[in-house]
């Protein structure tokens, strides 16, 4: 068998989901060697943009069959063979995660649901995240029973039975449950094999019209840089389809707010791709998988401090329209998941303010007319979206925004 060439870019995105403090970030660290919550360091280093994305190589030992992320087998020290490169999306804040997950922006091809063995199952966010996977139809799921080093065998078995009971009748009913200790890196090899077996790389169409969601944007120039040495603005995001190449002319929507006379409107930006990077690897072209840094000729003032987060990038003339109002058909959940009380969700009503997530965009909206499950919404910030796109809907419950369902754009 010919050796598989090592990939420069990840080919599949796997979401790390689960209750707070159940070990998502530690597990990402055990798999990739990267702590994903490290924003200030990330900005200091410039362009290694990973929005809590971290990649790892899955490798297999040809001698003893061990799965590992290392070039040499930890068991027999033979040289290992490269299988594929995967990217883990470890989203930090759980409430924003819920909305982002639901709007499909995190573009997960599969998910690892992390459940701690030393707490009763399910915890509120465990329920909330599994519901999000259900709504999104993400059915390539592996359940990780973490922190088994903190419980005895009997407790581990009881927790395992609780997990089985919890997932019965859900999208994760047949998901494998793998006991591990992320802290001691125990059973990580078994998890790597499960990722290979249960979360395949989806078939992607390289000829599809390229499109990308912008998750971050920055100015990478140091203060005091000479004008001749200034670099253009940088976009960090996830490609959802097609292939972008260095040299491509691109359009960014909704763009920037422009006032001419007494009229204010949003004007799309056009620019050129001058560089592409996945982590620290420079690319000539980029496909879906992992987070991609896109260097442009834009004035860095336009991209600083995440100013273009929520935008959509494509080839000129191929993007959906900019919408300042939308009509959605809402699918509301029965109860507010993730709260202790699990309050009943009331229907949408005219005049109410909602928080909406579409792609990587977040905007507030006021319902101008609600009739049954159809609502007309005026948006505070415009979005670039197609008919049929999904919108995550959150409502103020007490002092925080709570996910109450999703909608489909109808107009």
From Swiss-Prot:
Q: Per the record, which residues fall in region G3?
A: 90-93
Binding-site residues for GTP, renumbered to this chain: 21-26, 146-149, 181-183
- Offer an example of a GO molecular function term for this protein: tRNA binding
Give the region (G2) as residue ranges.
46-50
Extract the ranges annotated as region (G4). Answer: 146-149
Which NCBIfam families does this one have? eif2g_arch, PRK04000.1, small_GTP
Question: What is stated as this protein's family in its record?
Answer: Belongs to the TRAFAC class translation factor GTPase superfamily. Classic translation factor GTPase family. EIF2G subfamily.
Protein role = eIF-2 functions in the early steps of protein synthesis by forming a ternary complex with GTP and initiator tRNA.
What is this protein's name? Answer: Translation initiation factor 2 subunit gamma
- What are the leading ranks of the lineage? Archaea, Methanobacteriati, Methanobacteriota, Methanomada group, Methanococci
Gene name per UniProt: eif2g
């Amino acid at each position: 068998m010919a050796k598989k060439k090592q990939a420069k870019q990840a080919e599949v995105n796997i979401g790390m989901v689960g209750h707070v403090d159940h070990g998502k970030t530690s597990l990402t660290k055990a798999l990739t060697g990267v702590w994903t919550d490290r924003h200030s360091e990330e900005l200091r280093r410039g362009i290694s943009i990973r929005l809590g994305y971290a990649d790892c190589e899955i490798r297999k030992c040809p001698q003893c069959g061990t799965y590992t992320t290392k070039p040499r087998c930890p068991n027999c020290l033979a040289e290992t063979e490269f299988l594929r490169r995967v990217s883990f999306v470890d989203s930090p804040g759980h409430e924003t995660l819920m909305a982002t997950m639901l709007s499909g922006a995190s573009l997960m091809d599969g998910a690892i649901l992390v459940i701690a063995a030393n707490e009763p199952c399910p915890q509120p966010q465990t329920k909330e995240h599994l519901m999000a996977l259900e709504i999104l139809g993400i059915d390539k799921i592996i359940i990780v029973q973490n922190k088994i080093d903190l419980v005895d065998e009997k407790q581990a078995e009881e927790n395992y039975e609780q997990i089985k009971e919890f997932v019965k009748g859900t999208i994760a009913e047949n998901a494998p449950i793998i006991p591990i200790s992320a802290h001691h890196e125990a059973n990580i090899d078994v998890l790597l094999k499960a990722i290979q077996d249960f979360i395949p790389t989806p078939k992607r169409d390289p000829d599809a019209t390229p499109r990308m969601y912008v998750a971050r944007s920055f100015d990478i120039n140091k203060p005091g840089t000479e004008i001749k040495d200034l670099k253009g603005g940088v976009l960090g995001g996830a490609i959802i389809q097609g292939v972008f190449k260095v040299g491509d002319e691109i359009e960014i929507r909704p763009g920037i707010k422009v006032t001419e006379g007494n009229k204010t409107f949003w004007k799309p930006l056009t620019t050129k791709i001058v560089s592409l990077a996945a982590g620290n690897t420079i690319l000539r072209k980029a496909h879906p998988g992992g987070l991609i840094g896109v260097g442009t000729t834009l004035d860095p003032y336009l991209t600083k401090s995440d100013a273009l987060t929520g935008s959509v990038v494509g080839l000129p003339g191929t993007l959906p329209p900019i919408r300042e109002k939308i009509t959605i058909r809402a699918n509301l959940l029965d109860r507010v998941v993730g709260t202790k009380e699990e309050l009943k969700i009331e229907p949408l009503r005219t005049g109410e303010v909602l928080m909406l997530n579409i792609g990587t965009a977040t905007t507030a909206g006021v319902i101008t007319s609600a009739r049954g499950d159809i609502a007309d919404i005026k948006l505070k910030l415009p979005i670039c979206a197609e008919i049929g796109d999904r919108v995550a809907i959150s409502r103020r419950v007490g002092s925080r925004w709570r996910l109450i369902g999703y909608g489909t754009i109808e107009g």
